[in-house]
């Protein structure tokens, strides 16, 4: 499933995603947001750590991660880099806890 199809699927839910990309091994330190976030891996891979929950969510193309506002998360980009689609929602639009949805299941 390509980026255009993933964008269309998110748009069908009323979301307006942007995209971003990072190189192999890039790291995002633990942080939180005041808004809900929907992430979809479009290419490559990325592993999100959820330190407050003691969980890890590995995303490959087509996988989705819903992060409610206030969720502490960190990430490490895979060896081939990553391109993700990201949409923001008002805090409270997504029900906790964070939810990883594999490709084909959302």
Predicted regions and their residues:
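Histidine-centered metal-chelating micro-motifs
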Residues: 27-28, 65, 69-74
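Conserved short histidine dyad/triad with adjacent acidic residue
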Residues: 16-33
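A generic structural motif
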Residues: 49-51, 76
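Short acidic-glycine-tyrosine-enriched beta hairpin
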Residues: 53-69
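Short, conserved beta-strand element in jelly-roll/cupin
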Residues: 32-48
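Double-stranded beta-helix
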Residues: 1-19, 74-106
């Amino acid at each position: 499933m390509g980026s255009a199809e993933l964008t269309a699927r998110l748009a069908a839910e009323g979301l307006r995603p942007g995209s971003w990309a990072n190189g192999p091994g890039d790291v995002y330190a633990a942080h939180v947001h005041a808004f809900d976030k929907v992430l979809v891996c479009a290419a490559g891979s990325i592993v999100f750590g959820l330190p407050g929950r003691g969980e890890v969510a590995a995303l490959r193309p087509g996988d989705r991660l819903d992060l409610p506002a206030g969720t502490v998360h960190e990430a490490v980009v895979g060896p081939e880099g990553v391109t993700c689609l990201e949409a923001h929602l008002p805090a409270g639009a997504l029900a906790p806890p964070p939810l990883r949805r594999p490709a084909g299941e959302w």
